[in-house]
UniProtKB/Swiss-Prot annotation:
ADP binds at residues 22-26, 55-60, 155, 186-188, 212, 214-216. Its EC number is 2.7.1.11. The active site is at 128 (proton acceptor). This is ATP-dependent 6-phosphofructokinase. One of its GO terms (molecular function) is 6-phosphofructokinase activity. Homotetramer. Pathway: Carbohydrate degradation; glycolysis; D-glyceraldehyde 3-phosphate and glycerone phosphate from D-glucose: step 3/4. The gene is pfkA. It comes from Enterobacter sp. (strain 638). It is found in: Cytoplasm. Its cofactor is Mg(2+). Substrate binds at residues 126-128, 163, 170-172, 223, 244, 250-253.
Length: 320
């Protein structure tokens, strides 16, 4: 019987994490459970930095960006003896389960704790939208709004100077944020990690646009594909059009979460408590076709596939 649980945020922060913590805390207290917040993710779990939370601990948190519990990278958590210390710290406080809010690295930590006999529930908190078993992650839509606003501003100045603008978007190995922002922002060209990239092909497409009378253009590209400053120099040399690169960086992670992310985070947080009370452990929560679902966290990491949104790219190309 679950009586006490912990909650932590791990990895890169995302708008809506505070709303998710609030959902977990309020739902747990409503069900008569005690709940502890863990500071700075798995590092705080290892260092035994936890605090008991009440309803007032999460007051006025639903609209705040970031995570008030903090987050930290802690690669040492891969070591079994480190995780054993973390489990002992939780048992010392009488915790029966842990809710982990974060990305795929955070899920891996939850998976390993689950395999060591400590039940965890994972909630997808990342702007990258790269988590298996869910259509959308907490923070994705807020980050999308931030990126589109930046693209709109770049379009103003690009059109004024007949310039080609490259905008680098976060996402790591997933192009969802780039794709969605490119469609919403009317970008002329899209480069994502799921599709092989050739700078020569990109230049040819840009030249074709110029031949049709296009006086400016925006290229949306996912981070880590190439050096965007070098790409800008290459495009400018080949097209004789002024080209500038803008790296949006960590601004994409900040800001007050939008309504959808607040709702999604709240629903997922409350659902995590429902799952624990039903006796589930080692699960990760998702939303598919607007319905909350849960999957085995081991299967989600090791077996499940995350489909590429090829139809989004096809749509974008029709609108160039």
């Amino acid at each position: 019987m679950i009586k006490k649980i912990g909650v932590l945020t791990s990895g890169g922060d995302a708008p809506g994490m505070n709303a998710a913590i609030r959902g977990v805390v309020r739902a747990a207290l409503t069900e008569g459970l005690e709940i502890f917040g863990v500071y700075d993710g798995y590092l705080g779990l290892y260092e035994d930095r936890m605090v008991q939370l009440d309803r007032y601990s999460v007051s006025d948190m639903i609209n705040r960006g970031g995570t008030f519990l903090g987050s930290a990278r802690f690669p040492e958590f891969r070591e079994e003896h480190i995780r054993q210390v973390a489990i002992e710290n939780m048992k010392k406080r009488g915790l029966d389960a842990l809710v982990v809010i974060g990305g795929d690295g955070s899920y891996m930590g939850a998976k390993r704790l689950t395999e060591m006999g400590f039940p965890c529930i994972g909630l997808p908190g990342t702007i990258d939208n790269d988590i298996k078993g869910t259509d959308y992650t907490i923070g994705f839509f807020t980050a999308l709004g931030t990126v589109v606003e930046a693209i709109d501003r770049l379009r103003d100045t690009s059109s004024s100077h007949q310039r080609i603008s490259i905008v680098e978007v976060m996402g790591r190995y997933c192009g969802d944020l780039t794709l969605a922002a490119a469609i919403a922002g009317g970008c002329e060209f899209i480069v994502v990690p799921e599709v092989e990239f050739s700078r020569e092909d990109l230049v040819n497409e840009i030249k074709a646009g110029i031949a049709k009378g296009k006086k400016h253009a925006i290229v949306a590209i996912t981070e880590h594909i190439c050096d965007v400053d070098e790409l800008a120099k290459y495009i400018e040399t080949e097209t004789k059009r002024e080209t500038r690169a803008t790296v949006l960086g960590h601004i994409q992670r900040g800001g007050s979460p939008g309504p959808y992310d607040r709702i999604l985070a709240s629903r997922m947080g409350a659902y995590a408590i429902d799952l624990l009370l039903q006796g589930h452990g080692g699960r990760c929560v998702g939303i598919q076709n607007e319905k909350l679902v849960h999957h085995d966290i081991v299967d989600a990491i090791e077996s499940m596939k995350r489909p590429f949104k090829g139809d989004w790219l096809d749509c974008a190309k029709k609108l160039y």
